[in-house]
Amino acid sequence: MSAETVNNYDYSDWYENAAPTKAPVEVIPPCDPTADEGLFHICIAAISLVVMLVLAILARRQKLSDNQRGLTGLLSPVNFLDHTQHKGLAVAVYGVLFCKLVGMVLSHHPLPFTKEVANKEFWMILALLYYPALYYPLLACGTLHNKVGYVLGSLLSWTHFGILVWQKVDCPKTPQIYKYYALFGSLPQIACLAFLSFQYPLLLFKGLQNTETANASEDLSSSYYRDYVKKILKKKKPTKISSSTSKPKLFDRLRDAVKSYIYTPEDVFRFPLKLAISVVVAFIALYQMALLLISGVLPTLHIVRRGVDENIAFLLAGFNIILSNDRQEVVRIVVYYLWCVEICYVSAVTLSCLVNLLMLMRSMVLHRSNLKGLYRGDSLNVFNCHRSIRPSRPALVCWMGFTSYQAAFLCLGMAIQTLVFFICILFAVFLIIIPILWGTNLMLFHIIGNLWPFWLTLVLAALIQHVASRFLFIRKDGGTRDLNNRGSLFLLSYILFLVNVMIGVVLGIWRVVITALFNIVHLGRLDISLLNRNVEAFDPGYRCYSHYLKIEVSQSHPVMKAFCGLLLQSSGQDGLSAQRIRDAEEGIQLVQQEKKQNKVSNAKRARAHWQLLYTLVNNPSLVGSRKHFQCQSSESFINGALSRTSKEGSKKDGSVNEPSKEAESAAASN
C-alpha cells in the first residue's frame, strides 16, 4: 500500500475541532415503593374505622357515666371555640390535610386506590372527602382525654409517620415536576406526623402520671378567663402626659413601625384555635407555593441554558437580531442573558416569600388588636362602622371556611406576586442595569433623553406651584394661616391649567401602579379590605374575616366564659356549704380565726363577683347575647352599646338593676 493510500485512511484529525460531548439529561423512571400506596390505604382505612368504633363506644360509656344524653362527642373532634385547649393536635392534622391537598392536585391519580386517568375530576371530588375522613381519627383520639384514645392515637400516628418515611426513603426521586419535588413537598407532612407521634405518647405519659386533665369541659374551669377579667378590672396606673407638643423622633417612629410587624405573646391573651390553625397552614402554604414555583420553572431554564448552541445565532438572525458576528460570542451572550433571567426569577420568588412572611406577621398583630378591641365593644374602630356582634347565617358560613380561605388567598396571592415581581425585576435588569454596565441597548435612556423638555416642564411646573404656595400664597399671622395674594393665586392656577392636565396624566398612571402593587402585596391578607370603606362588603376576603370575628367574640368572650365558670364554681360551692351545715349539726365547730378568714374571703369573692357581673352587663359586645335585647334595632346601638336616648332605654336600666340586685343578694348571702 502506497503512502498516499495510507494518508487517505488517516483519521487522526477528525476530532481536533469537535465540540465537547454534553452530558445526557437524567431521566427519572417511575418509582413504586416497597410499601404499596394502594395496599397501605386499604389497611389504614380499615384500622381507622376500627379505631373510630372503639372511640365511639368509649364516648358512649363516658356520657352514660356522666348522665349525659345526645350524640357522641366524636361528632365534634375538637372545640374550635375553646381558647384554653392544646392546639398542637388540631394544627398538625390540618397541616397534614393541606399537604395531601397539594399532592393530590398535582398528582395524576388523586385516589391511591385507582390508577385510572380518564375520570380524574370525579376521583378528585372523592379524594377531597376521603382524606379528611382518613385523618379524622388522628384528631378524634385526643377528644375524650382518655388513655385508650392516646394509645390509639400513638399507634395511628406512628403508622402514618413510619409508612411515609419508608416510602420517601425507597423513592427519593420521582418524575413529577422535579426529581426531588415529592421529597421536599412531603417535609411539612413528615414534620406534622412526627409531632403527632411525639405528642400522643406525651399525653399518655401525663395521663398515667395524673397530670393531664381528663375533663372535656375544662374550658370554663380554666384560669385563663379569670386572669383576663382580673387584668381588665385592675386599676391602671396614671400615665404621665408630657406637656411638650414635639413630634416623635425618626428613630422612635422607625422602632414603633418595626414593633408593629413583630408579634410578641401576652400572658393574658391566647389566640383562638381557628386563628392558630390558619397561621400554621398559611406558613405551610407559603412553603409549598415557593417550592412549586422554584421546582416548576428553574429546571426548565437550566435545560434551556444547557441546550444553547451555535444554531441560536441563525435563529436570532431570522428575526433580524445580530448580537455578534462570532457565533461563539452569541452563545455566550445568550447563556448570560438566560442566567440573568434565572436570577430575576429567583429574586422574584424570594421577594414574594419575604413580603408574605411580613404580611403574616403583621396580620397576627392585627388579629390580637381586633379581638381585644371587640372584647371591649369597640366595633367602630375595628369595622369602621356600627355592627352588632351576634351570630348569623353568613357569619357562620364564613367562620367555617376562614382557615381554608386564608390558605387559598395566600397561594393565589403568592403566584400573582411572583409574576408581577418577575416582570418588574426583568425590566429593571434588561432595560436599566445591563445597559448601564455594558453601555449598549440604551433604548430606554434614549427615549427619556428625547423627552427631556417635556419632563423638565412638568418638574418645573410642580416645583413652581410648591414654592409659590410655600412663600407667596400662605400667610402666617398670630399662629394662624390664611391665603395671601389671591389674585396671583388665581392667575397662576389658570396659566398652569394645561400643564396640570399633563401632570394629572402622569399621576393617574402612578396611581394605577401604586394601587395595583398595594392590592397585589396585600392579596393574601384577610384582615384588611382592598376596597373603599363604603364598598367593603364586596371584598369577599375582608367580609369573611369580619364575620369570623363576630362568631369568635360572641361565642368565646373571656368575660362571658369567666362568668359561666363562676356559676359552675358557685354550684359546686353550694354542695360544700350543705356539707358544712351537716358537719355543724353534728357538733363540728371551726376555729374563730378560720371564721374571720372565711368572712374576708367571702367579701372579696362577692366584690369580685359584683365587678364581673357589672362588666358582663355593660360590655357592648355582649349586649346581643341577652334575650330581651334581641329585638333591639340597629339604630338603638352606638358602637355596639345600647343608646341611652333610645325608647328602650328603660329596658337597659332595668337589666342593669336586676343583675345588681342579684349581685347584692349574692354578696349578702356570702
From Swiss-Prot:
Residue intervals on the Cytoplasmic side: 60-87, 143-145, 204-274, 368-401, 474-488, 527-670
Domain of life from the UniProt record: Eukaryota
Deletion phenotype: Morpholino knockdown causes severe defects in embryonic development, with microphthalmia, a curved body axis and heart edema. The morphant hearts do not loop normally, heart atria are strongly dilated and blood circulation is severely impaired. Morphants have an altered morphology of the craniofacial skeleton, with malformation of the first and second arches and absence of the branchial arches. Embryonic heads at 4 dpf display reduced total retinyl ester levels and reduced levels of the visual pigment 11-cis-retinal.
Function in brief: Retinol transporter. Accepts retinol from the extracellular retinol-binding protein rbp4, mediates retinol transport across the cell membrane, and then transmits retinol to the cytoplasmic retinol-binding protein rbp1. Required for normal vitamin A homeostasis.
Residue span of region Interaction with calmodulin: 600-626
Places the protein is found: Cell membrane
Renumbered residue ranges of the record's region Disordered: 640-670
Oligomer and partners: Homodimer. Interacts (via C-terminus) with calmodulin.
A biological-process GO annotation: retinol transport
Membrane-side (Extracellular) residue stretches: 1-38, 109-121, 167-182, 296-346, 423-452
UniProt keyword terms in alphabetical order: Calmodulin-binding, Cell membrane, Membrane, Receptor, Retinol-binding, Transmembrane, Transmembrane helix, Transport, Vitamin A
Family annotation (Pfam families): RBP_receptor (PF14752)
Basic and acidic residues bias spans: 645-664
Protein name: Receptor for retinol uptake stra6
Gene name of this polypeptide: stra6
